[in-house]
Design a protein with these regions (language model features):
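Electrostatic, structured charged patches in enzyme active sites and in nucleic-acid/phosphate-binding
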Residues: 1-195
Length: 195
């Protein structure tokens, strides 16, 4: 009996994950908020998923390039794996390596993400576990007018809770207002206490 198209597709994903040296038993398909790729990013462990949310929520990171994972170019060393390339708000480009047992947070030109780093950032990881899907749900909508309204409200009132912004913009969809706020957070135009 032949395989169904869905089984063939799943086997392709598993083969690509195994080709980069990871286990195919725990797959996560995520869509980075700033990503324009048609296909989602495939992560193969809970640690990779947490590292993804950690990077997306890092307040000093302007953008994240996951091409090392996407194109199977993730260099590996014992105990380390190239995970992404980040550009900081200052414009510095850093290689990010997943190193679960590392005892340092970074070395020259590299940022290491270890279990201790992820454990110390549990609130950030949990917060961005909700923020990223909020952004992605609004991808098909034009948020620009709402983003402008949110900026105006913040300029007028200073700090506002998301709930207060939704009340101020009661004529708009709450989902779209929260999507606009989440987009502003990810673009680092505003700061929040989600860490």
């Amino acid at each position: 009996m032949g395989k169904t198209p869905a089984q063939k597709k799943r086997n392709q994903y598993l083969a690509s994950v195994r080709a980069r040296g990871a286990s195919g038993h725990n797959l996560w398909f995520v869509r980075p908020p700033q990503d324009t790729q048609a296909l989602p990013l495939t992560l193969s462990s809970d640690i990779e998923l947490e590292a993804f949310f950690y990077l997306e929520g890092s307040p000093d990171v302007a953008s994240v390039d996951y091409s090392p994972l996407r194109h199977g170019q993730a260099r590996s060393q014992p105990g380390r794996r190239h995970f992404a390339i980040v550009t900081t708000l200052e414009g510095t480009e850093l290689d990010v390596e997943l190193a679960p047992e590392a005892d340092k947070a970074s070395v020259a030109g590299r940022r290491l993400i270890s279990l201790s780093v992820l454990n110390a950032a549990k609130v950030r990881v949990q917060s961005w576990r909700a923020i990223v899907p909020t952004i992605n749900r609004c991808r098909s909508h034009s948020l620009d007018p709402l983003i402008i309204c949110c900026r105006r409200l913040l300029e007028e009132h200073g700090q506002l809770a998301v709930r207060d912004m939704c009340q101020q913009l009661a004529s708009e969809s709450t989902a779209l207002v929260t999507g606009a706020v989440a987009t502003l957070l990810r673009s680092r135009e505003i700061e929040s206490d989600v860490d």
